[in-house]
Structure formats: structure tokens, C-alpha cells
Amino acid sequence: WDAKNNRLMETSETKTSKKNWKEVIPHRDDVHLLDMEIFKDHLVINERKDGLRGLRIIHQKTGKDEYLDFGESTYTSRISTNREFNTNVVRYSYSSMLTPSSTYDYNMDSGQLTLMKQQEVVGGYDQNNYESERLYAIARDGEKVPISIVYKKDLKKVESQNLLLYAVSYTHLTLPTIAIV
């Protein structure tokens, strides 16, 4: 309702008419609210900003929020299935152009991160041999178009290197991931 990129509203179970709605997360032109998971003491939001799917954790008692820092410039993340309401641990999936599809448990109180599973990349892949960057090209209409690149660390970068464009920007396209073939 009145929010192209979505917004989050709350109401009581007994008074559900629109006049009783209270805004929890407002509409933002530059952020698309994609998904959420409710826990006893936390609200976890999956949102897209600048083409990247990130995770935002709101501590319900204090109202403070934090964005998980994945330590890479290009990535995608999704809230996984979390069946337990009374927990402070959220499970999510993560991948990037360097990191294979991974499942993590994150303790929303202590900040402890535990890798639960990671897809194997066969053939001797070592992500430490590669770099990943996020650049922007300016389109004819003046909009910034994100470009995610990955290259071997020993590559000599020069101003006029060629670029293979894998995908054109679509509204809901998130591609920064390793393709396992």
C-alpha cells in the first residue's frame, strides 16, 4: 500500500483494519524490502540496496539495528528457514563471486558467526587467489550501473581492459555468485 519498494506495518491480531496499522519500516526509494523473519527479540530484514541483497537485524527491545558486514564488495544473501521463534540465532545463505553458496548461523546477541555448510568447488579453486570489486558505469541517462568483477590477484590492471558483460541490469536481478558447473 502506497510503497513501490514495500514497507512493513504491524497491527494487533484483533484490530486488523488499515486505520490500526503502525509503520515499522517506512518505504524508501533506494531500498527494496524483500523478506523478513520475526523472532522473539529480533526482526531480520532481507533488503536490496544498490543491487545487493543484505541483511538488517533490528533488536526489538531497543530499536537499534545493524547491517551484517559480509566483508566483500559484491554478494547476495537470503534469510533461510528459521523454524524457532524463541531463539537469538538466525540462519541465512550467502554467496559472492568469490565465496561459494554458504549457510551460516548468526547469533544476533553475541555476533558469533558459524559456517554450517559450504558448497564445494572442485578443480582446485582457492578464493584467496582472486579479487572481487564493484565498479560503476554511468549510463546514457546518467544512472549509475553497478559492475561486479572478479579477477586473479596477479592480473596487471590497466585503464582500458575489456569487459565481458554477463547480464544487463534488471529490476530484481542479483547475480554475484560463483557458477558451479
Language-model regions, residue ranges each:
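Beta-rich catalytic cores
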Residues: 4, 32
